[in-house]
């Protein structure tokens, strides 16, 4: 049953081939048996999941159930879950049990989704390898000596290992698309504001966006349909009509205009990755799309601008974790300053501390104009690059990551090398655009991701373009050798 897609599970539940309790128990048993190898889950909610599955079966029997009712999924451990620990991968929140659900969690609960547990992640979503988690690194199911990508590495590995058919995730600079690429699955980051951030623990508020991880674009459409909503509790959520993401999945691509940014095929791109992406582009041409080279001239400034803006926002957001109201609290503080210093020093990991310090420096009185203001000006130029390109083409294609999965520890001593893993994904977040990654090949037995970038609120078009590729190829059906 674990090889079934979400769409197939929905059909199986409808046909009574199995019950929600049966398939939920199957995945729970699989997680308990196999996840000692991958470490993709922080918390398993077995008792709650079986209760939800029982309720879903009753709802299905009554004949009035939403599409995802009874389907088992998992949440990245950044979404607040009422009564269930939400750690954000950090010692700081190791004992935090929220008294409420995030809007994303509520949306899925209302649709009768069964939640198997909370997935591992880089601490406070800061990382590109899932090596910064307080709960230990997640291993890539394709090669357990390699990272799964980050920060949503737990969700990506769990989906790739068939421990769960789909999972929620978040993307601040590539944290859905990059691990999706490295684990050979489908990941979508919607337009900024398409999905509520309420109850999603903040890293960089102007960049964070929730999305999904699945094996297919068809499944991504089903998950996004439930996730997307307008929410008054999130002031950045946009009141924009929500498309039916499944209805046009099979629309023909004849006449589709594809832009290929020349800046995405320069120095640093693995030759095998480039070859796989170029082959994918030829597949689209065979389906009737036209391809033209385009330019995003400020691409080289995306990483430096991001690593001023994101740490600055992180510095402000993480100031709330002071050991007073919730989160880690040091023992026997001498005074208030000692409480702050030791609680934060003990609660945060090295990468989080690094970004807080960088952000605080960038926001300080003497450097605000030189760094933060300048980075925001660059952000505006990057956004204009995309506006200009989308006046010529319908979608942008390129590599998701410069290389396939790398070995643990190979980039940890060089933060800049790690940051450059997101060189092709960061600009999309700075501009607030939707982006996807779908598998398009392999290099040395490890997956390669093709990135699709769309115009604002063009998620339905991206899903159509991704689905059509998956009807012509079988990369999305391939599984790691160890998966049975």
UniProtKB/Swiss-Prot annotation:
Pfam families assigned: Amidase
Protein name: Glutamyl-tRNA(Gln) amidotransferase subunit A
Catalytic activity: L-glutamyl-tRNA(Gln) + L-glutamine + ATP + H2O = L-glutaminyl-tRNA(Gln) + L-glutamate + ADP + phosphate + H(+)
InterPro entries the record matches: Amidase (IPR000120), Amidase_CS (IPR020556), Amidase_dom (IPR023631), AS_sf (IPR036928), GatA (IPR004412)
Subunit: Heterotrimer of A, B and C subunits.
Gene3D superfamilies to which the protein is assigned, alphabetical: Amidase signature (AS) domain
Main function: Allows the formation of correctly charged Gln-tRNA(Gln) through the transamidation of misacylated Glu-tRNA(Gln) in organisms which lack glutaminyl-tRNA synthetase. The reaction takes place in the presence of glutamine and ATP through an activated gamma-phospho-Glu-tRNA(Gln).
Protein family per UniProt: Belongs to the amidase family. GatA subfamily.
One GO cellular component term noted in the UniProt record for this chain: glutamyl-tRNA(Gln) amidotransferase complex
Gene Ontology annotations of biological process type: translation
Keyword Transferase: no
EC id: 6.3.5.7
Annotated active site: 76 (charge relay system), 151 (charge relay system), 175 (acyl-ester intermediate)
Source species: Saccharophagus degradans (strain 2-40 / ATCC 43961 / DSM 17024)
Organism taxonomic ancestry: Bacteria, Pseudomonadati, Pseudomonadota, Gammaproteobacteria, Cellvibrionales
UniProt keywords, alphabetically: ATP-binding, Ligase, Nucleotide-binding, Protein biosynthesis
GO molecular function per UniProt: ATP binding; glutaminyl-tRNA synthase (glutamine-hydrolyzing) activity
